[in-house]
């Protein structure tokens, strides 16, 4: 480690241009004094650099971030992060527009600059670059390169430096690979739309670049980390209009930014002993960047609008506080064995000097305690010559000969060599233990995930069975209810038919009675005219009779006042007739009102019919969508079957290719053994060949049996999964059929209910008509009773008058006329009495019918309520079955996706056990072409990590490109079985070059050279497997 040095955090301020809405609604509140000073609201703020709105992306990068690239490549840690309110330009500053040279942000430019610096450095340097990309969303660390890792934790290494455990790390050897990683992470990042920003970042993103370099000549190793942080902006809910999930995100963003502000304030204060790094995961990760071992640059982004003046002021205050923080930076350097040796020698010499000085001081102290005064010259703290003299005798007392000295030097060199070997062994063992720990953790995580998947499957199966049983019970209940409704419907239809017949008969009778009433009314009018004529005659006759009686009374001396009551009775009859006329006019008005009510009811009935038609159209559209979804499901199932057939075909072809590879290996082994036997022993040639053939046949049989078992197990598993998928499809089809049946029953019930409602409306209208007719008949009864009473009184008066007149009259002509008038009046009165009797009978019949209908009306209303409730229940059950069918479809799709993901993860796990290639980059070379090999040194091999087998290449002249045959084979086998088979094969079989099925002359020459080298050095085993190479 180099000596530590202090440096302040560099703070630059960037002010973005105003957008269209701000230009229309506000004004500019910022004033640029110089390149280091800006004024907002009358307050002056100073920073390392001020970027105006017209500053380009390149200028921002050159002034703010370019120097950090050189620092990171020199072994320092670096951090660049953007801070500011929402929609202030942070993401544009950090990322910009990818692929656009003019609008690229700091991250893509810094990536390109790192590689440009590497290509211009000394050729003896070798670089390894790793990148990782994660975000802090809702106070959880989420890996943007592996979305399944949603809650990563922060740990500390042996030097107490925080790091994110479990984050995906990708090796990169070119800027294009790093940009691909950035694009992949950006596609997984959380964004949302607010009132202030259409692409508002809802999380803090951290892009980490780790650079390790090694000088191949001096073995000097340096490492540096570069954190590129895009913070989410602070938000005011009143301005952004956040609701729901966006509001929760804003709360977490403001909370983490508040924790960052608290850390900055505590560091700027300088008096606080506790720095609250652990209040937020973001501050925990950036602990080294804030007051630790890193060169940090903060880009504070502001808005020039007066609408955001308060937020801009708080952002500038944050920058002012951060500018006062000091970091202690050191070079991250791994010392070599020679450097550690030199340090050890220096410390040893220093220790010896301190021990000698300690002895001098102890002697001086003993003399002082004994009461002796020590002269100034002999005091230890002022006489360095005494220290030298005490150290010299130790060196002079030892007499060493040259031979012994040479021996000791040789032993010393050997010990140092052994120390170096032990150090390398310790490093290898530590790496191996770390790899094994990582593999154990991965296996445990895989096992726990498989257990969770199994438990989820068990719970889902139990829930599906329970839902299936509940659906069956519901279907039974629905069928029973439908049967009951059908029976009730038959009964009601019969009752309705009977009522319709009765209503028709009643309506016919009412029509007849109405016609009779019309005839009676016309006859009454005629009678009234006749009665008026008779009244006139009667009044004239009465007047003449009264005159005669008066004359007779005067002659006899009597009084004629007794005849006046007859005249009063005649006047009462006139009043009754006027009352009847008024009642007839009242009935006309009521008939008009009834006709208006009928029209209103007909209009409402037409509206209800239109509503029913619209609902039927909606049902037809829902059926069409259901049929379309079923067709899609059929097409998807057919695609799955086709892919499975293709998969089986590829597996068969893979088996054939593996058998051919084994045969070729066997043939090559036989050829090699033949050549060796010709050189050594020509006599035992046939015997060794037969033994080799027997061993190879046994190996081929064992390989074939193991492979067949593996394939059989995999095929059985695939068949079981297919069987489960078919069962789920059958269940889905049954549910769809039940859904269709319920839909049809629901439509039938709806039609029946519409018909019943129409009939009920007709019955209610008829009932209203009957009520009105009853009221009308009541009035008629009263008027007819009054008329009958008046007619009865008139009849008595006429009879009495006629008797008196017959007794008193003397002339025959008058008697004949009066008798004729009385007979005509009697006939009319008898006709009216007959009509009244018929009307009373009709009235009584109507009253009886009304009473019967009133008794039946509550029953019909109860039945109607029951049917309406049942229809509602059926609608709810239909809705629930629809939702259940949708849930089943979603569950089925999720199950299919889960099975696919499990297969993909299994294949990925098998591939993950293979080698992870750490791509080394040699400095001083131009960037490699996309199609060539990247970062290859020392004979054309890439640096290999993990447990994968290396690729053995023939000499470069005339050799074809290597083709990997083992990827697909490893997919069909378990990793352990594949490794065992490979080890067994490597014990006896040589490695074939991956150049194809045919051996070239260069391949044969290379194999002969390897066999000779193997024979010459029997003590050393060849590096054939990855495990041997790793050890």
Swiss-Prot record:
Biological process terms in GO annotation: anterograde dendritic transport of neurotransmitter receptor complex; axon guidance; synaptic vesicle transport
Positions with biased composition (Polar residues): 964-977, 1014-1031
Localization in the cell: Cytoplasm, Cytoskeleton
SUPFAM superfamilies: P-loop containing nucleoside triphosphate hydrolases
Composition skew (Gly residues), residue ranges: 932-949
Binding residues annotated for ATP, in chain numbering: 84-91
Segments for region (Disordered): 673-692, 906-1031
Entry keyword set: ATP-binding, Coiled coil, Cytoplasm, Cytoskeleton, Microtubule, Motor protein, Nucleotide-binding
Gene Ontology cellular component terms for the protein in this record: cytoplasm; dendrite cytoplasm; kinesin complex; microtubule
Entries under Gene3D superfamilies matching the protein: 6.10.250.1590, Kinesin motor domain (3.40.850.10)
Globular, as annotated region: 858-1031
Coiled coil residues, start to end: 393-857
Pfam family, one: Kinesin
Highest taxon of source: Eukaryota
InterPro entries the UniProt entry points to: Kinesin-like_fam, Kinesin_motor_CS, Kinesin_motor_dom, Kinesin_motor_dom_sf, P-loop_NTPase
Compositionally skewed regions (Basic and acidic residues) per UniProt: 673-686
Residue span(s) of domain Kinesin motor: 8-325
Family named by the database record: Belongs to the TRAFAC class myosin-kinesin ATPase superfamily. Kinesin family. Kinesin subfamily.
Complex formation: Oligomer composed of two heavy chains and two light chains.
Entry domain remark: Composed of three structural domains: a large globular N-terminal domain which is responsible for the motor activity of kinesin (it hydrolyzes ATP and binds microtubule), a central alpha-helical coiled coil domain that mediates the heavy chain dimerization; and a small globular C-terminal domain which interacts with other proteins (such as the kinesin light chains), vesicles and membranous organelles.
Job of this protein: Kinesin is a microtubule-associated force-producing protein that may play a role in organelle transport.
Official protein name in the record: Kinesin heavy chain
